[in-house]
Regions:
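N-terminal glycine-rich flavin-associated loop
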Residues: 142
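Short, structured active-site "lid" loops
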Residues: 108-111
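Exported/periplasmic ABC-transporter solute-binding proteins
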Residues: 2, 11, 33-105, 116-117, ...
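N-terminal secretory signal peptides
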Residues: 1-15, 19-32
């Protein structure tokens, strides 16, 4: 971890520059997007708490941190549709592996949206998914460089130079797994030199909790380069970072599955939201945010 700015401080600094409603995933990192709740019980006698919760029209969604901004836009549109005006949506954003662990340890949610299939499969194997997951979006990888390019990284080969400060995530986090897979493909190109992927990984100075923290590290100039999703760059103010494209032959397509969970307290609203995300309107919002359509 770089000593100049721990992840929590870096995240705070970034959030002070851009308005969005997400917090990095911890058991308490829930942010709510609320309207006027019009739901009421038809009973005149008090109901048990568990039954009231079962009849709730409030949605709790666990979603990959790379979806933060686009899902915020989704909520704004979805909640204006008939039947959704009083819906309250609470989103817990973080690395998909962190969210998967929280769910396996008993956290309750209506929907899980992961940045890779692996985490969703593990949640399904734990018996937590209601029905089948569907792929609703795709993404691709880019190399991100801070303003001023202090490491003088101009080509993919430069990532392997001694002394380059490279930032990533652990391999169990989707972006970390995708980045390592892409580096392995790049290692087959003679132009990148022998042992390319091992040299780049040896340059890692910090393994962050999720992709948004990778972007923060690079944006603040605390790393010379990192690999993130192409969509993450759209959230950074113009001029603060530049990118190096990874060719299709070495890129990795990130697939995002979404599913309703058996712990859902608002399954009908969850189904409506997933239907909206997969609809032409929802897909157009994803495309506008630089995601690839399902």
């Amino acid at each position: 971890m770089l000593p100049t700015s721990p992840p929590e401080m870096a995240a705070t600094r970034l959030q002070s520059r851009r308005a969005f409603i997400a917090l990095f995933a911890t058991p308490a990192s829930l942010s709510a997007c609320r309207g006027t709740n019009t739901a009421s019980s038809a009973q005149t006698t008090p109901e048990p708490e568990s039954r009231v919760a079962a009849e709730s029209n409030d949605l709790v969604i666990f979603a990959a941190s790379s979806l933060t901004l686009v899902l915020d836009k989704m909520w704004q549109v979805f909640r204006t549709q008939p039947g959704n005006e009083g819906l309250a949506i609470t989103a817990n954003y973080g690395s998909s592996s962190q969210l998967r662990t929280q769910l396996q340890e008993g956290a309750k949610a209506d929907i899980f949206a992961s940045a890779d299939v692996v985490q969703m499969e593990q949640v399904a194997k734990a018996g937590l998914v209601d029905g089948n997951a569907t792929i609703f979006a795709r993404n691709r990888l880019v190399v991100i460089i801070p303003k001023g390019n202090p490491g003088k990284v101009t080509t993919l080969a430069d990532l392997a130079k001694p002394g380059i400060k490279f930032v990533s995530t652990p391999p169990d986090v989707p972006i970390g797994a995708y980045a390592r897979a892409s580096l392995k493909k790049l290692a087959s190109d003679p132009a990148n030199g022998n042992g390319y992927d091992a040299k780049v990984l040896a340059n890692i100075v910090s393994e962050e909790a999720n992709v948004r923290q990778v972007v923060v590290k690079v944006q603040l100039g605390e790393a010379d380069a990192g690999i993130c999703y192409a969509t993450d760059v759209t959230a950074v103010p113009a001029g603060e970072v530049t990118t190096i494209d990874i060719p299709d032959s070495a890129n990795v397509v990130a697939e995002y599955p979404i599913a309703i969970l058996k712990s859902a307290k608002a399954p009908a609203a969850a189904r409506r939201l997933i239907s909206f995300i997969n609809s032409p309107s929802g897909q157009s919002i994803l495309v506008a945010a630089k995601f690839k359509p399902a």
